[in-house]
Amino acid sequence: LADLAAADLVLWLPADDGRFIAAAHCRPATSTTVHVDDIIGLHLPAAREIDLRRALHSGEVVRSPAARWAGTYSMMETCVPVCHEGRIIAVVTREANLSSPRLSLGFEGWTVAAADTLCQMMARGEYPYDSTPQVTSHGVPRVLDGALLLDAEGRVQHATPNAVSCLRRLGIRTHVTGKVLAQEITEVIGDGTLIEESMAVVVMGRASWRVEIAARASTVSMRALPLVNGRKRLGAVILTRDVSEVHRHEQELMTKD
């Protein structure tokens, strides 16, 4: 979420003394961090508590009306209530450094819109997901590794250059924008390839699972981030990562053993 939003995420818990204390912090890999120093365990300045209390009591996402000057940079802050089992238990601040240019990764702003949707889902208790993929030795795909945006029907709306490169490794040479990702992948896999049962669910963006797809001596790991509003499917973000070299290294070690 931090990478999609190109912003720091700070989890604030209401303390017994009525103030907020920082319990967790995640820096973005797609922009410059707002907090250079470690802030875990620190209290929120009283001047910033108004928006957090609004989010905590209203259960709605609260955006600052204007940028705030923070020393040597300006910052735009969004307060996102964290809903769990129908109760607001914390607030996440999404803090974007406006003085630093975002990394040019071919995103064209759609990742920020996807982050907005995930924040709305967090306020409704729909994100983080109930089930998340386990971290393997290959790691979990990140936004920097490659990202695609699918609509509710599984059609590709946007793709970062790294995601396009991952698809090319699998043998998908044509432009995928406007096409159903699942169909494009099925065509290049081949009949003799073992297909994981979860593949269709992931590449259609219907569950927050992870799957590895192998074709043409290449292996690409994919993870789905479904975008929903209640029972309505809005689409999904698919994160991709080329793990071919890792697989080849593992095969070499097995051969030596």
Where does each model-flagged region fall?
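Conserved beta-strand and immediately adjacent loop positions that scaffold enzyme active sites
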Residues: D8, T78-C79, G146
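PAS-family sensory/regulatory modules and their coupling/dimerization elements
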Residues: S64-H84, A90, E184-E245
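Amphipathic alpha-helical coiled-coil segments that mediate homodimerization
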Residues: L1-A5, D51, A114, S131-V135
